[in-house]
């Protein structure tokens, strides 16, 4: 997550202190974004002082601000989108239904992005949860960036909401 809670949560998951998780779609995806694009993040400790012009500059440079942390769209979101789209299309063509976290589990456990990790994978709570196959409840998936990607791909006919 943008608050780097994954470091302590991953340790608790691996120590069998966590048996299920409920989180927002943003919490789910941000752990993976951080995993592959950490070095490209921008920290803005004085985020309350940003002017509308400052905000526009961040947007123009493809940074999505979450409080004091700016997530790089191209290095994080679009990279993960490509991997998820393949999984969504494959699931739709096979008539398979999955929960949002199951697509991330598949991505993480496949090793497809392992060479792109920019943080210690031991700090990823989602990877720890995938390794334990923990159930995750994700209300509000549609409000997340990847949830919006999924909706747009459905609207444009590239996949369907099986």
Regions found by a protein language model. Name each.
Residues 2-162:
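Conserved catalytic alpha/beta core of Sir2/sirtuin-type deacylases, generalized to analogous enzyme cores
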């Amino acid at each position: 997550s943008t608050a780097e809670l994954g470091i302590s949560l991953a340790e608790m998951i691996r120590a069998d202190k966590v048996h299920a998780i409920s989180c927002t779609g943003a919490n789910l995806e941000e752990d993976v974004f951080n995993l592959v694009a950490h070095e490209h993040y921008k920290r803005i400790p004085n985020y309350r002082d940003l002017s509308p012009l400052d905000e526009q500059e961040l947007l123009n440079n493809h940074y999505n601000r979450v409080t004091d942390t700016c997530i790089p769209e191209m290095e994080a979101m679009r990279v993960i989108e490509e991997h998820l789209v393949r999984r969504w299309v494959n699931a739709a063509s096979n008539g398979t239904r999955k929960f949002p976290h199951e697509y991330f589990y598949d991505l993480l456990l496949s090793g497809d992005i392992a060479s792109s990790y920019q943080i210690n994978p031991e700090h990823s709570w989602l990877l720890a949860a995938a390794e334990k196959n923990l159930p995750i409840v994700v209300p509000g998936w549609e409000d997340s960036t990847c949830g919006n990607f999924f909706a747009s791909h459905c609207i444009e006919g590239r996949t369907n909401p099986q």
